[in-house]
Amino acid sequence: MRSLNKNARHQASGFSLIEMVIVLAIIMVAASISFMSAGPVMKQQRVTNAYTTTLAAMRLARGYAVAQRTSYSVAFANAVSPSPYATVTVAPVVGGLFQGERNTVTYQLPQDVSFLAQSGLPTASTAVPDGYGSGATAIDFGWTQNGIGTGGQSTIYFCPDGSSQRAPGTNNDGSCPGTWDGGVVYLARAGDLLSSRAITVMGVTGRIRGWRLYANTGGYQWQRQ
């Protein structure tokens, strides 16, 4: 009898094959759900990283220009084959005795994020970020402080007084010629309108601001970050 009871206890312990299959199935379903949920989050995080990188590069350039009493350029470019990356390049203006101390640095954005103004963005002058352009040009600098100008410029220059201008000075003292240059740059994942971000620069002050697109009743609206 003792032997029979001992065997019975051994048979009752552990998991049966059916129970193990059920547990494995539950784990696989949970893992699949987690993977599907993580996909959109990772995509959004890459957009956030691109936005943060671009914003930081612009603020660094302005800070360098003020601290070193010279001019720094910031150039924006989408991917050019064979490179799959959009880039932001910060560089000291070369020439004269007041050349910046920092070397040229190029920042790469995540591969699925580019400088992009997608169809569906607000286009009215009262609805675009800080009133620059019409929401149709991805890299759109070259506007004066009151929103007048041609736009479409892809390079801006930060100057010793903190302002943003369209060209560096030519008198070799690090100054700028006084042509204030503001504008906006848009970033997004292609086909994902609500991933859109924007960064504006006010020419006369060099103020840099970030924006994010949100859906509202009847359309979309930019909100400052």
Show the residue positions of the predicted features.
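Alpha-helical hydrophobic helix detector
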Residues: 20-37
